Amino acid sequence: MNPNQKIITIGSICMVVGIISLILQIGNIISIWVSHSIQTGNQNQPETCNQSIITYENNTWVNQTYVNISNTNFVAEQAVAPVALAGNSSLCPISGWAIYSKDNGIRIGSRGDVFVIREPFISCSHLECRTLFLTQGALLNDKHSNGTVKDRSPYRTLMSCPVGEAPSPYNSRFESVAWSASACHDGISWLTVGISGPDNGAVAVLKYNGIITDTIKSWRNNILRTQESECACVNGSCFTVMTDGPSNGQASYKIFKIEKGKVVKSVELNAPNYHYEECSCYPDAGEITCVCRDNWHGSNRPWVSFNQNLEYQIGYICSGVFGDNPRPNDGTGSCGPVSSNGAYGVKGFSFKYGNGVWIGRTKSTSSRSGFEMVWDPNGWTETDSSFSVKQDIVAITDWSGYSGSFVQHPELTGLDCMRPCFWVELIRGRPKENTIWTSGSSISFCGVNSDTVGWSWPDGAELPFTIDK
């Protein structure tokens, strides 16, 4: 091959290589453009993934779904119109109680940042259930937990966290400054009632969607106090019961009707010889039933039921299966206060089913220990002590405490009835144990018409803690 042919051959090869390289570069550019177009086109397409977050903006619940596309997060939003909880359904028929939650707050608090609390309770919206609780402005196993046996102080606040979680600074939200409280959701927003201030002039601050909407001043100047459990909502109105006056004698009791955080009506009960404290209230077929604590002279529980116009009836649970603590052994009941061991008491609850009643109570007749549910098929109206079902919740050898009712509306469960539920406070520390603090964890159960089991679900923390030694 002569020199000219070599030059032509080499030039041809270089040209072919150059053309191939150019084609590859053009293909690469086209590929990048197509990929970018696909990503851009998908930005406004909601897709399914595993993480959803609920936020609240301008009285509209917003479902935010995070969509992962090529390591980039986009947010697809779909508004859910708020609807007031009807509250018109009857209680669901049940045969027993299934465990719903247990927070193990004291066990976790031995090494973790967990609030010192008391008076926990549960309330549900149409989207979620939350545990509400009164903190002492302190953490377990810390010096500020000293002396937290005290009920009323300026450091106490109402806070909330997702049900079943130990209450900590990392999962809890502030609700109100309070040493006595109630809260509930009307289907549109949360209503909180927080009482704070001096014993002779406390004020209840009402908040709706976190904003102060009204206040209620102590009218007897003697420790204004409320339920320590959820209020009850029907057709956009929420109802709560408050007490003002002696804890060991005749006091004053009022029912309040609240709409969007504003008191629209109230009535004082005409209830001589009755004593109502720390009522546990629930809606049933459009009306409200509250079962309360008689701290004056009754070892059975007083009740008040009322309609949305606050027309009310009052009475005591007649059953000889007594529900308060302290109390006598079961025997002959009364539709008025049973005076034997009637002084003092503990917050509790019952659910009325016609003439029958589910009674929640401590197992011990003299101390806040153990817990059980008892079904008395005639107990709302009859005075005998016969019952047909008893389900163990906490063994008598383990501490219990306050207990109260809450419900899950059909808008949450999808059922055609109101599901009855209850929680039990498991108090630990002072005055019964050798610690510098008083706090508690909680368990909860919901009524079902299927298989259940009796057992013991105690607090389970090993005391004392490091701070106590």
From Swiss-Prot:
Pfam families: Neur. Disulfide bonds join C92-C417, C124-C129, C184-C231, C233-C238, C279-C292, C281-C290, C318-C335, C421-C446. One of its GO terms (molecular function) is exo-alpha-sialidase activity. Residues 11-33 are annotated as: Involved in apical transport and lipid raft association. The keyword Disulfide bond applies. N-glycosylated. Its cofactor is Ca(2+). Keywords: Calcium, Disulfide bond, Glycoprotein, Glycosidase, Host cell membrane, Host membrane, Hydrolase, Membrane, Metal-binding, Signal-anchor, Transmembrane, Transmembrane helix, Virion. One of its GO terms (cellular component) is virion membrane. Ca(2+) binds at D294, G298, D324. It is a single-pass type II membrane protein. InterPro entries: Glyco_hydro_34, Sialidase_Influenza_A/B, Sialidase_sf. Its main location: virion. Substrate binds at R118, R152, E277, E278, R293, R368. Inhibited by the neuraminidase inhibitors zanamivir (Relenza) and oseltamivir (Tamiflu). These drugs interfere with the release of progeny virus from infected cells and are effective against all influenza strains. Resistance to neuraminidase inhibitors is quite rare. Residues 91-469 are annotated as: Head of neuraminidase. It is found in: Virion membrane; Host apical cell membrane. Glycans are attached at N50, N58, N63, N68, N88, N146, N235. Residues 28-469 are virion surface. The influenza A genome consist of 8 RNA segments. Genetic variation of hemagglutinin and/or neuraminidase genes results in the emergence of new influenza strains. The mechanism of variation can be the result of point mutations or the result of genetic reassortment between segments of two different strains. Intact N-terminus is essential for virion morphogenesis. Possesses two apical sorting signals, one in the ectodomain, which is likely to be a glycan, and the other in the transmembrane domain. The transmembrane domain also plays a role in lipid raft association. Belongs to the glycosyl hydrolase 34 family. Homotetramer. Catalyzes the removal of terminal sialic acid residues from viral and cellular glycoconjugates. Cleaves off the terminal sialic acids on the glycosylated HA during virus budding to facilitate virus release. Additionally helps virus spread through the circulation by further removing sialic acids from the cell surface. These cleavages prevent self-aggregation and ensure the efficient spread of the progeny virus from cell to cell. Otherwise, infection would be limited to one round of replication. This is Neuraminidase. It comes from Influenza A virus (strain A/Parrot/Ulster/1973 H7N1). The gene is NA.
